[in-house]
């Protein structure tokens, strides 16, 4: 048993006979009243996402999860195929199980796959960032800075990201998988 205040993104717990995956977990302190945990949760089986508020002291049963490294290969319709990087076994995961993570799946990306004790796939955990190419955006503005208002850019997977005004089509960018936000140009050296 673990208290709700200790729940973090990616954790899986059991509630009312269902496996629930934490998509987001935020501490919230309203002006009046006690602190609450506001969470986005996904039913592992159905893929349904709900927003739930819990008291920090509420307890839930964590589910033991086995992680295996796997490489994304391809998709056919709503089924996505991954290959275990150690055993070369292939696994299919439904679009419902993946949810919004689909927008970050690039060919050959390596993810962690989550399995229950009875070897059922629960879902995947993405790396913290991915590199993607800008497929469509307005032309870049010369002399623009990162501090500008930004503009929307459609990435090669269909993900829409707010990027600085100086970004052009065809550029490779580093995108955070937590919020889908622009981090930097790929291959740029930190200053």
UniProtKB/Swiss-Prot annotation:
Entry protein name: Elongation factor P 1
MF (Gene Ontology): translation elongation factor activity
UniProt function note: Involved in peptide bond synthesis. Stimulates efficient translation and peptide-bond synthesis on native or reconstituted 70S ribosomes in vitro. Probably functions indirectly by altering the affinity of the ribosome for aminoacyl-tRNA, thus increasing their reactivity as acceptors for peptidyl transferase.
SMART domains: EFP, Elong-fact-P_C
GN (gene name): efp1
GO terms of biological process kind: peptide biosynthetic process
Similarity comment text for this entry: Belongs to the elongation factor P family.
Keywords on record: Cytoplasm, Elongation factor, Protein biosynthesis
Pfam family, one: EFP_N
Source domain of life: Bacteria
